[in-house]
């Protein structure tokens, strides 16, 4: 159970409208031993590299999935393999497109909580592209390059619209390791919405140029997620690793670092 001091501290950083219901639920979840981190499009598992040490110092076992990005089924299978190796309650975390992956895979009984980091959060069977089209089109979409059945983000769009608040040399390194996604991947519909049955947290990036911030707020509200907002680009896990780690620790029932 969260201490009164920690409870008050959490209230200070979480939007009041969404925080109170989420906090009530969060106090009843088991304390997690493990965290599984799932990356999204235009990235790989190394995008979590600055978040991981905070979690490890708190005593959590951390696994970062390397998604093939060849199909939703393949990505979900990679996440399920990671979950299968955990030995107890596990917080499942997804950034960006990985919100789709954790929504599909998150009904695993080991998953004690879900954390969405500037992420998609589709309902089961939902046409997420149609939902996203009801919000302003993000700038990064103009920089997508397609070739031979796969797509990635061009360098200019990556540096400006995906990782705009990252030191340029670091952003170029992230650009170099980005995964290539299969053309059909973003439009694949899920069959499950784990956020409907699992305690859920969400982080909104207010300066996001890859997913519209208002769409992120809509998703967080729809999920009744405990929500924080950061003045960040889409890659908040890189520009604000401590804040993201603290959110994950709260979902795991641990004190922030």
Roles of regions detected by a PLM:
Residues 93-98, 102:
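Gly/Ala-rich beta-loop-alpha elbow adjacent to hydrolase catalytic centers
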Residues 40-43, 96-97, 120:
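Active-site glycine-rich loops that stabilize anionic/oxyanionic intermediates
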Residues 29-88, 138:
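Active-site catalytic motif of lipid deacylating hydrolases and related acyltransferases
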């Amino acid at each position: 159970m969260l201490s009164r001091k920690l409870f008050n501290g959490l209230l200070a950083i979480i939007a009041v409208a969404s925080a109170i219901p989420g906090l009530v639920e969060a106090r009843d979840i088991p304390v997690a031993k493990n965290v599984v981190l799932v990356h999204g499009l235009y990235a790989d598992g190394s995008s979590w590299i600055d978040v991981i040490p905070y979690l490890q110092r708190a005593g959590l076992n951390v696994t970062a999935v390397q998604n093939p990005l060849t199909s939703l089924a393949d990505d979900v299978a990679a996440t399920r393999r990671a979950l299968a190796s955990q030995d107890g309650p596990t917080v499942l975390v997804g950034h960006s497109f990985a919100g789709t992956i954790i929504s599909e895979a998150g009904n695993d009984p080991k998953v004690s909580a879900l954390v969405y980091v500037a992420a998609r959060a589709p309902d089961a069977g939902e046409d997420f592209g149609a939902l996203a089209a009801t919000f302003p089109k993000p700038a990064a979409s103009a920089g997508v390059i397609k070739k031979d059945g796969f797509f990635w983000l061009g360098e200019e769009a990556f540096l400006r619209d995906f990782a705009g608040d990252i030191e340029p040399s670091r952003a170029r390194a992230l650009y170099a390791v980005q995964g290539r996604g299969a053309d059909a991947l973003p439009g694949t519909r899920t069959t499950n919405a784990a956020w409907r049955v699992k305690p859920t947290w969400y982080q909104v990036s207010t300066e996001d140029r890859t997913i519209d911030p208002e769409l992120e707020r809509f998703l967080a509200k729809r999920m009744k997620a405990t929500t924080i907002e950061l003045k960040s680009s889409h890659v908040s896990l890189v520009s604000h690793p401590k804040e993201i780690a603290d959110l994950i620790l709260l979902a795991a029932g641990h004190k922030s670092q």
